[in-house]
Amino acid sequence: MEKFSVSAILLLVAISGTLAKDTTVKSGAKKDPKDSRPKLPQTLSRGWGDQLIWTQTYEEALYRSKTSNRPLMVIHHLDECPHSQALKKVFAEHKEIQKLAEQFVLLNLVYETTDKHLSPDGQYVPRIVFVDPSLTVRADITGRYSNRLYAYEPSDTALLYDNMKKALKLLKTEL
């Protein structure tokens, strides 16, 4: 019986030692800053403005735009793209852009849609395209580049803001 008790105690000590992991950082070891921050759940905003209302799919966004008579702003981006990340940071922190964005149906995509009208000059990121409630892509609202018409950089916030105001002036659908 005594042998059994000693064996059981040794087994419990071994198991508890294995299960208890050292969570402290040893001196000289660097702690990864990504590990110190808790992973936030992914939302539809993907960091472009958590207080804004975002749509989940392109089809839903088109429907909401048409029924609410508000223009649609489609932001194409990639999580791994440094240009997309820089534009996202500026977009999310720019108070006037965030306020104006409330008047749009918003969609941000990390994948391409089957609608080729959203990529008239190629599939690149970041790219922002405006769609009128009449479901017409606003080809007249472009960025500052002639080879990437719908590209914006963090320094283009004034142009983006002006283009958002232009997009709010809806196309006339009268016959």
UniProtKB/Swiss-Prot annotation:
GO terms for cellular component: endoplasmic reticulum; extracellular region; extracellular space; mitochondrion. The lineage of its organism: Eukaryota, Metazoa, Chordata, Craniata, Vertebrata. InterPro entries: AGR/TXD (IPR051099), Thioredoxin-like_sf (IPR036249). Expressed in lung, skeletal muscle, testis, liver, stomach, colon, small intestine, the goblet cells of the intestine and the mucuous neck cells of the stomach. Belongs to the AGR family. It comes from the Eukaryota. GO terms for biological process: cell chemotaxis; digestive tract morphogenesis; endoplasmic reticulum unfolded protein response; inflammatory response; lung goblet cell differentiation; mucus secretion; positive regulation of cell-substrate adhesion; positive regulation of developmental growth. A motif (Homodimer stabilization) lies at residues 45-54, 60-67. Keywords: Disulfide bond, Endoplasmic reticulum, Proto-oncogene, Secreted, Signal. It is found in: Secreted; Endoplasmic reticulum. Monomer and homodimer. Interacts with LYPD3 and DAG1 (alphaDAG1). Interacts with MUC2; disulfide-linked. GO terms for molecular function: dystroglycan binding; epidermal growth factor receptor binding; identical protein binding; protein homodimerization activity. Residues 29-38 have a biased composition (Basic and acidic residues). Residues 21-40 are annotated as: Required to promote cell adhesion. Residues 24-44 are annotated as: Disordered. Residues 1-20 form the signal peptide. Required for MUC2 post-transcriptional synthesis and secretion. May play a role in the production of mucus by intestinal cells. Proto-oncogene that may play a role in cell migration, cell differentiation and cell growth. Promotes cell adhesion. This is Anterior gradient protein 2 homolog.
